[in-house]
Each structure stands twice: as structure tokens, then as C-alpha cells.
């Protein structure tokens, strides 16, 4: 009995010892896991505290001043604001009497404004106090999407002095006021001045700037209705002493008229500003007549094919192509000049003499009149519809409609295209899905049967709940550590940059998406030489549905311009919310980088050569003409390529997708593969090229453009802080003049002037028709040439094959020419043929027009039909 009791006691002691030992190991293991979990929490808190130092600085203040509160109590922070409602600011009440300030503001041209543009604002800050003042000027505006932006500038005014300055402030579509404040260095508001803007709401206006010694002669240009009053003109007199030296200063204008004025009075910077404004979409009209040397002489070397002659008196008929109530009412005797504009298209003529010639310059137009524009003032005042006819013929309906739509939709089209372009990121930031799935599977196995069976084996089931907690903390730490390489710790950027290079300047246009991973205020510093334009969408609810802009309205984005940097600050912005901006910088081409060469193009044959002067290799290089391209591929630094060694390919107009995919090589990849970096690079380049073609290469131009992609990653070029996290792509471009003449014979596209639609449905932007009914077009071959031959060039088959899934097909069917002798349409066989002048003679009108009918022989559907490109060769008259 005693022996059995001792054996039982011994076994119980041994079991207790074993359980105690197991428990000890379990407790020690639990302690280790718990310590690891606590360490993970500490690591997370430390990393969060150390991350995004700019957010902490933004919360503490920027440039030594406190950020305004973003809550509804902002009114308390602006107590006793001195209201300024007149033309000048009222003196503020300063308790110490150190600086007594007043503010005067004027804007635009004659205090007129237009949304969706940079608005020139002239500010005069008067200091009638006894001590100098140094502080900040803030301008608060509301963008077209209802977002409040604030622009801030450093200002200084000595005792008894007046500080004058001009600022260019982006004005959103629908914006009708700007709230100005002046604050001291400590952040206290000293002057508050709301300015209500004079913005036309009823009829969209086309702003015309007049640069003339006698602007009164051009008064007839004001108040004219264009294209059935789709637009209404408004003129403004410009002063050479106040003429801007940057193209941003001309952004408010749609048209610039130079007449009876010596352009050489302007500086080189002012002349360059005009040309870059034209390249960006402006329309320049030059009057000539007796003062042709003054107006055109400055531009003659770069605009004309040959020198112009001396002015002489000529009898012209302005009513030749314009219906007048009285026959002969358009006959005028004026001094005219025969001008040969490079790549020019005759808009108005009289008995074959060009009266108004225009040439496309990138996105803009340069037009030259053969006479002094003041000489037709009396005629235009009597026949007001002639201005409608002239501007509609010059601008085209597409440009007129775009100007009109800007009033209503603002930059929405640009916003959506930019969003598609840069709403991406670095693929290296994507997590490894399979690794996360494996860790999750291990966690579930350990958390369920694994942990339970382990504890049961040691008779420690009572610790299961604690084990679950500890195991969860451990795996949370593992997941967190796995995500360190994919986590954003501060503000990050995705961008797409277009670098346009000429022999004189390098222009960087960068579209950037700024995002921050925290719900806290943040800031980023840009290089000071960049201008900043927000890109926003239109407010879907229409004008007036957003909250009224007041002094108490907090801003979401602030742009602070100083000599050291341009700072973008954000507050009240949810984490990872995109803010889109267009950054621009123009600098002298000191190192003479870029592309140069010659391009010869005549009767379908390409020649010449191009050289890469960038100090690095470029990739996916291509020379693009209107409707044609030559693929050059990779080019080393300093390499020269002969264009005759490469195939000239005709692509479908307006179909940027197949063209970009062909140039960048995206089409060579199969299915989408985000793990393939080469595919992603091709896709990003393709997206940028599509954007460029859709927004910058939208119309006819006589020049060629060489495009390529940089092999260098200059991702922080626009940033002050070069350590910031960026990701993007850069495209390089240069314009090249095309020699399309031989022995005074010219070769050009007939589509340089939009055909007249006689019947049917035609889209001039893409040169296509609808197959539901026949299409009849009247082509204008140009009155400045004697036609020698005509060729209809078809799109390369490979583009049509690549475009099988789109809504565009090649035209197949019958083509008829109208015979002026018989009055009937004759069936023509044009496949691969060039028609000479003898074959064309029955079909050409005295004004060199050709009427063509297209009859589709396929099954009528909803697809557009790509028409062949008519190319004409002729000798200059």
C-alpha cells in the first residue's frame, strides 16, 4: 500500500515537473513573441513619426508663418479684417502704427477676364507708415471643380513707398472673383480686398489684342459675331512698354493683330514670347501694305519662302468668294504686297492674287494679309458679316468650337487626358501577391490546427487564446515588414514630361500627379524657374452649385512663389488624392542640345538626314510629317541617320493609338503583363505619345517633327528636393523644316485647307466618312499654284490590320470627279495612279477646286471609313 502510494506520488511529482517545465517554455516563448509584437508596434510608431517630414513642417507652419485653420472656425482667425471694396485698398488699423497699407488691383485687359486662362493681375501696395513692410500677398480663387486654390507671393514696401508688381494667376472656368489679402511676417492679416471679375457669361468671347500705332483704324474688329455668333470678338489695345516678355503674359488672348506697327521696337524676348504663344495655340495676324517692312520684316527669314516685293496699288475684290448685296461693292483700290508664306494656305484671294494667307505653326496659326488691315475698315463696317466669313475661314469651325466650349467645360478634356496619362505608378511598388498568399496560408494553418495541436500535445490548451493573440501580432509584424519596400512614406509624384528643343530655347512641359499617403497637411518644393498651372475638371453640377468663396473659406491647395522655390501646399485633402499640375520652364539652349537636319519630301519620296545632339542615346525615334512617318528607332549620341534608308509610312489621321503603338513597340507584346518592365515602359511611352498627338499635333502643318524618348531618368528635374520619390517618362521633340519643292514646283497635302462638304457626312480631323450615304467634297488645291499632278495616297495596310478592333475601316468603293464640261460625275480609276494636268483639266474649276464623290461599296455600318490622302504638285504662280 505504502509502496503504491509512493509510486503514485512520484508519478504525480514527475508529471507536475513536466507540466511545469512545459509551462515555463511556453511562458518564455510567449514572452518572446509578445516582446516581438511590442517591438513591431514601437517600430510602426517610430516610422510613422519619422515619415513625411514635410507634413510635420506643414503642420507647424511654412516659411515662418502659421497655416490657416481648416475648420469652420476660420472666421475667428480673421478677426477685424479691414474690408477694401473700392478701387484702392483702405488703410488697415495697426495697433502699433508701424505700417499703414492700402491695396489697388487691376486685372486682365481693361478689367476683363476669361476663365481657364492665366489672368494678368497688376498690384500696387502702398505703405503710408513710418517703417518698411515685408510680408505676403495671397490671392484666393475657386477652380472649375469647386476646389479652392490660394497663390502667395512675397511683397515688400518701404516707408512711404508704393510697390508695383504683375502676377499671372490661373483662373478656373466659372471663377468670378479673387480674394486678396496682405499679411505680415507673423501671419496676421493686415489688408483684405475681394475683387469681383468681369467675365462674360452669355456669349463666349474671342479676345483680340491690337498692336498698332493707330488702333482706331481697327475698331471694326470689336463686337463682331463669328460663326453664327458662336463667338463674339472683343478687342484690347496693347502698349509696347507694357508688352509681356513671356508667353504666359499673352495667354488671355486668342488672337494678336499687328498692323501699322514696327515690330522691331519689341525686344528679342518679347518677339520670342509671341512665337511661343503661337506655338501654344495663339493666332497671329500680320497686316502689311505700305508698312510691310515694319510688320513682316522682322519675321521674314523664318516665315517666308522668298523675299516679298515692293507694295503697289492693286484693285481687289473682297466679295469674290463672299456674297454681297450690291455687285461690285467689294471692289477696293489698296496698296498690296505679294507674300509667299512658307507652308501657307490661301484663305482669301482676288483674281488669283492671295489676299490672306495662313500657315499652321504647331498648335497655332500665323496669317499674313497682303494689305493694311485698316484699309478695309470702312468696307467691314458696312458689311459686318464679312468679318464672320474671314475669321471662320481662317480659324475653322473646330477651333471656333473649342474656344466656345472652353467657357462651359473649361479644361475638362485636358483633365481627363492628363489623368489617364499620369494616374499610374512604379511597378516595383506593387506587392508580391504570391508571397502574401503564402504567408497568409501559413498564418491560417498555424492559427488553426497548428497552434491547437501544438498546445494540446503539451497539455497547454488553456493558453490557446493567448497564443492566437501573440501569433496575430507576430504575423502582423511580418506583413508590415514585407510591405516596407512597397510603402509610401512621404509625398510622391508620377509625371510625364515633354521637352521641346529649338536652337535657341529648351521648353520643358511636365504634367505631374502629386499625392500624399497621409490625411495631414503637406508641402512640396519645386524648382523656382517653373510656372504652375492646376489642371481641374469642371464641376458636374454646373456654375453656382458650389459654396460661395469668402474670406472664411479654407483653401485646399496653396502655391507659394519665392526666389528660392515654388511651394505647393495641401490641406484638407484625403490620403492618396490626386492633384494634377502642368509645370513649364523655358531656358536658353546653352549646350545646343536637340535634333537637327534636313527633310526633303516630294511626290511620295523622303530624303535628308537627322542628327542626335543630345549627350545620351534616344529610343523609339521617329520623324513625323502630316499623315506620314519614318521610324528611326535607337539613335546614339551624335549619330546621324539618312532618311532615304528608311520606309515612309502613311498612317491614318486622328488614330493616335495605332501610330503610338507602332512607334513605341507596344503592339509587339502579347497580353497585358504588369510584371514585364519592358512592356510597361512601352505602354507608358505609348500613352505619352498618344497624349502628345491628340493635344499638340491636331492639325495640318508644313513642318516635320522628330520625336524620341530619353534613355535617361531625369525624374527630379522639376523638384527642389532631389531625394523625392518620382516615377515617369520623358519625350524629346524638335521641329524640322521640310523642303517640299523642286524647281519652283510645290508638293503638299490638299487637306491643308479643310474641304467643303457638298453632301454626306465627313470628319475633317480624321479624314473619314460615314458609309451610310455617298460623300461629296470640294477640295481646294490652292490658287497660288498651277496644278501639275494629283495623287491619292492610301494608308499603309499594317495600320489597318492593327486597327481591326477599332471603329475605322479603309474606304473601298468608287470615286467620281465632277466634270465641269459635261456637268456629270465621271468614274475614276485611281489605284496607285498619279493624274497629270491633262487628265485633270476637265475637273478643275477656274479657282483650282476639285469636286470628288465617294461611294462606299461595302455593307453600311457605324464604322468610319478612312479616305485616301490627296496630294497635289504644282508650280508657283
Spans of model-derived segments:
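Aromatic-Pro/Gly-enriched surface loop or interdomain linker
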Residues: 115-117, 173-255, 259-262, 409
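Noncatalytic modules at the cell exterior or secretory-pathway interfaces
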Residues: 837-861
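An acidic, glycine-rich "communication" segment
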Residues: 286-367
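Short, hydrophobic beta-strand segments
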Residues: 153-155, 165-174, 645-647, 839-842
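Short alpha-beta junction capping motif
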Residues: 250-297, 360-369
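Accessory, solvent-exposed terminal regions and/or long lumenal/extracellular loops of proteins
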Residues: 518-820, 860
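Alpha-helical transmembrane signal-anchor/signal-peptide segments
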Residues: 52-53, 465, 483-504
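A glycine-centered loop/beta-turn motif at secondary-structure junctions
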Residues: 283, 338-449, 850
Amino acid at each position: 500500500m505504502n509502496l503504491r502510494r509512493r509510486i503514485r506520488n512520484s508519478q504525480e511529482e514527475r508529471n507536475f515537473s513536466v507540466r511545469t517545465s512545459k509551462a515555463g517554455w511556453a511562458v518564455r516563448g510567449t514572452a518572446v513573441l509578445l516582446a516581438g509584437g511590442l517591438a513591431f508596434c514601437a517600430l510602426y510608431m517610430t516610422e510613422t513619426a519619422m515619415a513625411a517630414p514635410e507634413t510635420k513642417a506643414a503642420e507647424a507652419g511654412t516659411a515662418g508663418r502659421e497655416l490657416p485653420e481648416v475648420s469652420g472656425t476660420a472666421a475667428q482667425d480673421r478677426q477685424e479684417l479691414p474690408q477694401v471694396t473700392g478701387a484702392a485698398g483702405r488703410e488697415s488699423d495697426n495697433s502699433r502704427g508701424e505700417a499703414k497699407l492700402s491695396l489697388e488691383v487691376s486685372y486682365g485687359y481693361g478689367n476683363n477676364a476669361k476663365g481657364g486662362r492665366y489672368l494678368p493681375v497688376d498690384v500696387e501696395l502702398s505703405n503710408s507708415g513710418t517703417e518698411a513692410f515685408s510680408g505676403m500677398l495671397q490671392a484666393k480663387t475657386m477652380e472649375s471643380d469647386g476646389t479652392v486654390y490660394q497663390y502667395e507671393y512675397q511683397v515688400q514696401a518701404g516707408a512711404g513707398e508704393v510697390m508695383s508688381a504683375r502676377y499671372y494667376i490661373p483662373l478656373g472656368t466659372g471663377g468670378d472673383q479673387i480674394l486678396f489679402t496682405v499679411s505680415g511676417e507673423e501671419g496676421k492679416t493686415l489688408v483684405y480686398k475681394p475683387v469681383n471679375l468681369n467675365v462674360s457669361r452669355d456669349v463666349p468671347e474671342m479676345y483680340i489684342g491690337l498692336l498698332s500705332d493707330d488702333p482706331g483704324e481697327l475698331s471694326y474688329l470689336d463686337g463682331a459675331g463669328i460663326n453664327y455668333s458662336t463667338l463674339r470678338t472683343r478687342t484690347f489695345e496693347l502698349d509696347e512698354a507694357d508688352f509681356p516678355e513671356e508667353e504666359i503674359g499673352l495667354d488671355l488672348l486668342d488672337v494678336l493683330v499687328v498692323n501699322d506697327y514696327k515690330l522691331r521696337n519689341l525686344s528679342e524676348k518679347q518677339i520670342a514670347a509671341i512665337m511661343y504663344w503661337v506655338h501654344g495655340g495663339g493666332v497671329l495676324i500680320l497686316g502689311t501694305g505700305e508698312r510691310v517692312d515694319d510688320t513682316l520684316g522682322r519675321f521674314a527669314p523664318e516665315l517666308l519662302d522668298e523675299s516679298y516685293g515692293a507694295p503697289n496699288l492693286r484693285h481687289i475684290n473682297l466679295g469674290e468668294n463672299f456674297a454681297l448685296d450690291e455687285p461690285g461693292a467689294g471692289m477696293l483700290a489698296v496698296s498690296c504686297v505679294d507674300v509667299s508664306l512658307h507652308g501657307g494656305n490661301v484663305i482669301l484671294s482676288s483674281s488669283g492674287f492671295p489676299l490672306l494667307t495662313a500657315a499652321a505653326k504647331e498648335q497655332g496659326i500665323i496669317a499674313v494679309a497682303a494689305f493694311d488691315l485698316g484699309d478695309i475698315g470702312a468696307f467691314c463696317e458696312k458689311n459686318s458679316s464679312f468679318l464672320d466669313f474671314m475669321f471662320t475661314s481662317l480659324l475653322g469651325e473646330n477651333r471656333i468650337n473649342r474656344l466656345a466650349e472652353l467657357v462651359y467645360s473649361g479644361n475638362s478634356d485636358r483633365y481627363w487626358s492628363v489623368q489617364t496619362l499620369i494616374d499610374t505608378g512604379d511597378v516595383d511598388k506593387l506587392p508580391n501577391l504570391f508571397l502574401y498568399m503564402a504567408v497568409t496560408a501559413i498564418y491560417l494553418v498555424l492559427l488553426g490546427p497548428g497552434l491547437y495541436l501544438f498546445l494540446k500535445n503539451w497539455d497547454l490548451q488553456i493558453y490557446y487564446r493567448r497564443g492566437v493573440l501573440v501569433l496575430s501580432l507576430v504575423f502582423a509584424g511580418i506583413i508590415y515588414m514585407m510591405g516596407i519596400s512597397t510603402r509610401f512614406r512621404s509625398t510622391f509624384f508620377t509625371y510625364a514630361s515633354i521637352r521641346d528643343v529649338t536652337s535657341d530655347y529648351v521648353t520643358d512641359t511636365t504634367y505631374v500627379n502629386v499625392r500624399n499617403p497621409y490625411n495631414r497637411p503637406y508641402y512640396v518644393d519645386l524648382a523656382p524657374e517653373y510656372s504652375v498651372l492646376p489642371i481641374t475638371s469642371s464641376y458636374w453640377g454646373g456654375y453656382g452649385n458650389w459654396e460661395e468663396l469668402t474670406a472664411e473659406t479654407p483653401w485646399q491647395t496653396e502655391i507659394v512663389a519665392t526666389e528660392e522655390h515654388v511651394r505647393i501646399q495641401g490641406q484638407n485633402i484625403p490620403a492618396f488624392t490626386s492633384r494634377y499640375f502642368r509645370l513649364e520652364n523655358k531656358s536658353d539652349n546653352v549646350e545646343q542640345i536637340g535634333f537637327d537636319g534636313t527633310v526633303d519630301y516630294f511626290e511620295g519620296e523622303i530624303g535628308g538626314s537627322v542628327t542626335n545632339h543630345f549627350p545620351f542615346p534616344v529610343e523609339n525615334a521617329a520623324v513625323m510629317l502630316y499623315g506620314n512617318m519614318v521610324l528611326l528607332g535607337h539613335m546614339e549620341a551624335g549619330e546621324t541617320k539618312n532618311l532615304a534608308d528608311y520606309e515612309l509610312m502613311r498612317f491614318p489621321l486622328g488614330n493616335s493609338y495605332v501610330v503610338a503603338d507602332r512607334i513605341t513597340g507596344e503592339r509587339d507584346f502579347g497580353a497585358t503583363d504588369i510584371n514585364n518592365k519592358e512592356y510597361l515602359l512601352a505602354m507608358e511611352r505609348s500613352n505619352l505619345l498618344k497624349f502628345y498627338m491628340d493635344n499638340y499635333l491636331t492639325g495640318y502643318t508644313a513642318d516635320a517633327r522628330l520625336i524620341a524618348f530619353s534613355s535617361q531618368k531625369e525624374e527630379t528635374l522639376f523638384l527642389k528636393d532631389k531625394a523625392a520619390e518620382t516615377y515617369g517618362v520623358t519625350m524629346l521633340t524638335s521641329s524640322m523644316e521640310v523642303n517640299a519643292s523642286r524647281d519652283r514646283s510645290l508638293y503638299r497635302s490638299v487637306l491643308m485647307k479643310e474641304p467643303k462638304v457638298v453632301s454626306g457626312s465627313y470628319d475633317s480631323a480624321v479624314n473619314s466618312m460615314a458609309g451610310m450615304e455617298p460623300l461629296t467634297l470640294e477640295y481646294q488645291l490652292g490658287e497660288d499654284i498651277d496644278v501639275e499632278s494629283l495623287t491619292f495616297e492610301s494608308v499603309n495596310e499594317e495600320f489597318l490590320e492593327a486597327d481591326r478592333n477599332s471603329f475605322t475601316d479603309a474606304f473601298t468603293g468608287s470615286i467620281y470627279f465632277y466634270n465641269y464640261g459635261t456637268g456629270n460625275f465621271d468614274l475614276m480609276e485611281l489605284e496607285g495612279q498619279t493624274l497629270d494636268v491633262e487628265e485633270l483639266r476637265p475637273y478643275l474649276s477656274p479657282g483650282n477646286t476639285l469636286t470628288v464623290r465617294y461611294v462606299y461599296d461595302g455593307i453600311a455600318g457605324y464604322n468610319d471609313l478612312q479616305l485616301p490622302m490627296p496630294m497635289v504638285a504644282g508650280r508657283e504662280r
